[in-house]
Amino acid sequence: MQVTARVLGGLFGLAAGVALAQGAVPAAQGVSASTFTTDLMQLYREARLQDPRILASRARAQAGQEYQREAMGTLLPQVSLNAGVNRIHQENELVQQSFDSEVYSLVLRQYLYNKSTWENYQKFKSMAKQSDSEALEAQSEATVELARRYFTVLAAEDELELIQAELRTTQKSLDRVNALYAKQLALITDQLDLKARVDGLAAQVLDARNQVSVSRAALAEIVGRPVKEKLSRARDDVQLRVSTQSLESWVREGVAQNPALKANESGVEVAGAALRSGKGGHYPTLSLTLSAQQSNEGYNNALVPRTDSYVAGIGLQVPIYSGGSTSARVRGLYQDQIAAEQQLESVQRRVVKEITSAYLTADTSAEKISASRHALASAQLSRAAAEKAFGYGMVNAVDVLTSVRNEYRAHRDLLKTQYDFVTNVITLNRWAGKPPGESVASVNLWLNPGSPAAGIADPR
């Protein structure tokens, strides 16, 4: 039994050594990937031009500017030119005649005081600011989603690479155990355990390969084209950390410049202007009218010599009673203002919560990365010790397989922790109101454009 155990132990060590010599596995089968490499910044630039959410938000922001200009136009002089030609036929006891009359007029009207119109302009001015902030918020949200899908692709490819590497190691061990079993130098239980593990890993490879395709399709949805290039991966030579800023500093920064918060602040201004515009229905309006008219038609449609008339007038309109509709509208607008203020409070609380959550999670992830590296090193030592113990007959094949599985699991945990950290940093920057391009540029420095397919080597 000890001889068999030593032989199998040597086989496990040999299989791991062969797998290590092979290095990183080739690109995932079933996924078309070119020899080119792209990174997060490049995909961000493409998404800015292709993501429908970003394009729609820009269109709404531009529309807001035009609506503001439209409201401004109602405050400026309104000039109209009128022209008319009439055919008139007159009969009486003395005369019967027909003639053509012509009327030309130029009229200018200008509000001297109209509270409703002025406050309506202020409302659309605030709405334009709100649309701009919402466009920036949409871009920030889309950037976080892009980063999340980017690292989901990396995680899926890593998972496939790790499963394939584990499958290779286990398959080589199974091949040699089968050869020894044919010579009655191995136990049937060791053979069956290895066979079951190989079959299970083969099924996992299919699922992992499918997940790679699905995750790349999700990334293509944002970019607007199939993403077939290799993706730049996280570097191992940089220290991942949030920043030297305190949590309180991040919160203050977010409350001051978060675009979602600014959009809701503008929403409160919109509601306030709408309320003041509604109250303007109780105020009088004062307007100036200037007109010039030329006509050959006089009183009672009489034909007269062509006459030029010039009129300047001031009109005053005082609302007295509108059936209570103006007061009801004001009360409704007041409730709208309260709702906008409460929405602002809700968003502000959410900003504080999201910043706190992202900061603490990223800070914990940074510490967890170091712990995961130690865990991986320990798992590698544990696997080596298990193989050595198997050689002395102290453990069985199941124990060795468990140690190998633990080593791959530790590698998965390390990679996942790195991706979670980067995603949380981008999320933190989003809620803190940092420009999306600046956030992506800082994260892109942590990526290595020359990294291999998954940057994963079979365990040592």
Label every PLM stretch briefly.
Residues G9-A19:
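Bacterial N-terminal signal peptides
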Residues A21-G84, V227, R233-E269, P319-I320, ...:
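Bacterial Sec-pathway N-terminal export signals of envelope proteins
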Residues V25-T37, N82-L112, E119-N120, K125, ...:
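Small/polar, glycine/serine/threonine/aspartate-rich low-complexity segments that form flexible
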Residues Q42, S101-V103, R148, D193, ...:
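Transmembrane beta-barrel architecture of outer-membrane proteins
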Residues R45-L55, Q62-P77, E91, S105-K123, ...:
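A glycine-/polar-enriched beta->alpha junction
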Residues A203-R225, L376-K434:
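Short segments within alpha-helical structural elements
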